[in-house]
């Protein structure tokens, strides 16, 4: 019933611009955030509270493996709400040291034929100091990560201090931090994935916080570059890698080529990035999987795809576009599917399935 209702609501939402809908949903989430009884009521219905899904990961207890990916709650305006909707955690941001408006609108587009979204938002956010104020008003201990990126007007040569500022302001308010050097929508940002550029950024963030530090990488890296980042991650002793961000590739889309071209530049999330994100995850796990946590994100639409990421080496998962197209029941279905699959394989915890290559057996 809820799924059918959401499908009808989605048709209505798709008559409005994507960014307008995002603002409406954000306001709704802020309302749920502000009214504790409403938040508790939602939280009594949607989450899958199954002990088999609970994990201790880099010293943090995650009640469920699927989290909200960065990009939705950019300013930490509803940090307590995401657990009520069934997410095991939420990654807030991307946050930059200084406030910035992002790129000119329109900058957010739907590709419904591909169950995808194209965005060139450009890290629009209120800045680390204001986000810190929001987080200091939190009302729960739900798990949150914070994704930090480079301020657009800051030159690449000054990126280290820019990331350091964000880490100092936000590190102690999060359960973990993610260094974002992989968005395609800030000029020159992806160049910071090069090992010699990334090393001092990681060091600065690690020095500025006591919480686990991870790095988020692009799906468009070459295999050699993936290996180089993985080796650096081990060398620097970071907690994990988030794989992957959006893709700049336009290959294999069902949406007509001219329609996509008219949308312009940006990163694509959703189904089109699924296969490459899985390949990157598999390569990372083969290379460094026993030495750090891998978070699988990118095109997870079904419980089977979620299971495939775990079996390929992901300890935790994230999604954003899947929620847009699937609604709150998408979160619930993912968790029910993972729990059922664990039991189908006679496993008692997710960590036993990570990297196991066990197949999806449910019909």
UniProtKB/Swiss-Prot annotation:
Superkingdom field: Bacteria
What broad class describes the main subcellular location of this protein? membrane
The terms under GO molecular function for this entry are: dihydroorotate dehydrogenase (quinone) activity
Name the coenzymes or cofactors required. Answer: FMN
**CDD domains assigned:** DHOD_2_like (cd04738)
- PROSITE patterns per the record? DHODEHASE_1, DHODEHASE_2
Query: Keyword Methyltransferase on this protein?
Result: no
Pfam families in alphabetical order:
DHO_dh (PF01180)
List the catalysed reactions: (S)-dihydroorotate + a quinone = orotate + a quinol
Details of cofactor binding: Binds 1 FMN per subunit.
EC number(s) per entry:
1.3.5.2
Subcellular localization, per the record? Answer: Cell membrane
Which parts of the sequence bind substrate? 74, 119-123, 180, 185, 245-246
Q: Name one GO cellular component term.
A: cytoplasm
Q: Which UniProt keywords apply?
A: Cell membrane, Flavoprotein, FMN, Membrane, Oxidoreductase, Pyrimidine biosynthesis
Q: Give a yes or no for keyword Flavoprotein in this entry.
A: yes
Chain residues that bind FMN: 70-74, 94, 147, 180, 216, 244, 270, 299, 320-321
Q: Which PANTHER family match?
A: DIHYDROOROTATE DEHYDROGENASE (QUINONE), MITOCHONDRIAL, DIHYDROOROTATE DEHYDROGENASE (QUINONE), MITOCHONDRIAL-RELATED
Q: Tell me how this protein assembles.
A: Monomer.
Which HAMAP family does this one have?
Answer: DHO_dh_type2 (MF_00225)
Family, according to the entry, reads as follows: Belongs to the dihydroorotate dehydrogenase family. Type 2 subfamily.
Q: Which NCBIfam families match?
A: PRK05286.1-2 (NF003645), PRK05286.2-1 (NF003648), PRK05286.2-5 (NF003652), pyrD_sub2 (TIGR01036)
- The protein's name: Dihydroorotate dehydrogenase (quinone)
Q: Which organism is it from?
A: Corynebacterium diphtheriae (strain ATCC 700971 / NCTC 13129 / Biotype gravis)
């Amino acid at each position: 019933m809820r799924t059918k209702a959401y499908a009808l609501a989605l048709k209505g939402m798709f008559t409005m611009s994507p960014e307008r809908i995002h603002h409406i949903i954000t306001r709704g989430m802020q309302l749920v955030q502000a009214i504790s009884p409403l938040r508790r009521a939602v939280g009594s219905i949607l989450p899958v509270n199954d002990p088999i899904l609970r994990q201790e990961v880099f010293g943090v207890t995650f009640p469920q493996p699927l989290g909200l990916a960065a990009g939705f709650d950019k300013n930490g305006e509803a940090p307590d709400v995401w657990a009520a909707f069934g997410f095991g955690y939420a990654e807030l941001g991307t946050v930059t040291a200084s406030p910035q408006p992002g790129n000119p609108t329109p900058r957010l587009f739907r590709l419904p034929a591909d169950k995808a979204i194209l965005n060139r938002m450009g890290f629009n956010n209120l800045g680390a100091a204001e986000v810190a104020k929001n987080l200091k008003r939190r009302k729960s201990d739900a798990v949150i990560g914070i994704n930090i990126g480079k301020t657009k007007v800051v030159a690449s040569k000054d990126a280290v201090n820019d990331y350091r500022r964000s880490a100092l302001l936000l590190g102690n308010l999060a359960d973990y931090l993610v260094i974002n050097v992989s968005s395609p929508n800030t000029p020159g940002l992806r160049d910071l994935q090069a090992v010699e550029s990334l090393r001092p950024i990681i060091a600065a963030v690690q020095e500025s916080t006591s919480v686990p530090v991870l790095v988020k990488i692009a799906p468009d890296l070459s295999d050699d570059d993936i290996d180089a980042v993985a080796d650096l991650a081990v060398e620097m002793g970071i907690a994990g890698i988030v794989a992957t961000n959006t893709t700049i590739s336009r290959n294999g889309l069902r949406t007509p080529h001219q329609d996509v071209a008219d949308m312009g530049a940006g990163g694509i999330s959703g189904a089109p990035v699924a296969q490459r994100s899985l390949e990157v995850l598999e390569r990372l796990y083969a290379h460094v999987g026993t030495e750090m946590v891998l978070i699988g994100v990118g095109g997870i639409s079904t419980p089977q795809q979620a299971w495939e990421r775990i079996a390929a080496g992901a300890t935790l998962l994230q999604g954003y576009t899947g929620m847009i197209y699937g609604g709150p029941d998408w979160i619930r279905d993912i968790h029910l599917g993972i729990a059922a699959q664990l039991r189908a394989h006679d496993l008692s915890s997710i960590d036993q399935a990570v990297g196991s290559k066990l197949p999806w057996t449910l019909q």
